[in-house]
Amino acid sequence: DGIPSFVTAGKCASVANQDNFDLRRYAGRWYQTHIIENAYQPVTRCIHSNYEYSTNDYGFKVTTAGFNPNDEYLKIDFKVYPTKEFPAAHMLIDAPSVFAAPYEVIETDYETYSCVYSCITTDNYKSEFAFVFSRTPQTSGPAVEKTAAVFNKNGVEFSKFVPVSHTAECVYRA
């Protein structure tokens, strides 16, 4: 076994976090439109998530769904929640069979887009993932240009992102 392909030399970008992050406004349906590919995410197209705010957990119960490369429809349930050590927009992902990872909302307007960064540095290597979320499944338009500028400004190269396919056969049931 070698080093996984998503582990690369370097350190994580030091990204900004959304000021005055409002968990309740962030809740609801989001579509992934562009991603830095993630070996831990088995779905590769029609990716959508439902973020259900939970007052008891002070965070989100998340269901993400979509199709894997074998055209199987998969649903994954996990939690995303803030911690006392960081601002509210710097949360943790708690998912089955995955170590706890950061979930940093760099910027969102809550209505159209969200820029999310997740990266862990170990020694001089990083495991870097990032996501463009949209309230609609469109993969082009002004929101994409806006999110590209946000990531580039924060030291995350938007050229590393790939579009997520959202075609007519997509089913959104999460």
UniProtKB/Swiss-Prot annotation:
Gene3D superfamilies: 2.40.128.20
GO CC terms in record: cytoplasm; extracellular region
Keywords: Disulfide bond, Pigment, Secreted, Transport
Subcellular location, record wording: Secreted, Extracellular space
SUPFAM superfamilies: Lipocalins
Disulphide bond pairs: 12-119, 46-170
Tissue expression summary: Found in the carapace.
Primary location recorded for the protein, binned into one broad class: secreted
GO biological process: lipid metabolic process; response to reactive oxygen species
Listed Pfam families: Lipocalin
InterPro entries in the cross-refs: Calycin, Invtbrt_color, Lipocalin_ApoD, Lipocalin_CS, Lipocln_cytosolic_FA-bd_dom
Recorded GO MF terms: pigment binding
UniProt subunit comment: Oligomer; Can form dimers (beta-crustacyanin); or complexes of 16 subunits (alpha-crustacyanin). There are five types of subunits: A1, A2, A3, C1 and C2.
Family stated for the protein in its record: Belongs to the calycin superfamily. Lipocalin family.
Function summary: Binds the carotenoid astaxanthin (AXT) which provides the blue coloration to the carapace of the lobster.
Protein name: Crustacyanin-A2 subunit
Protein species of origin: Homarus gammarus (European lobster)
Lineage: Eukaryota, Metazoa, Ecdysozoa, Arthropoda, Crustacea
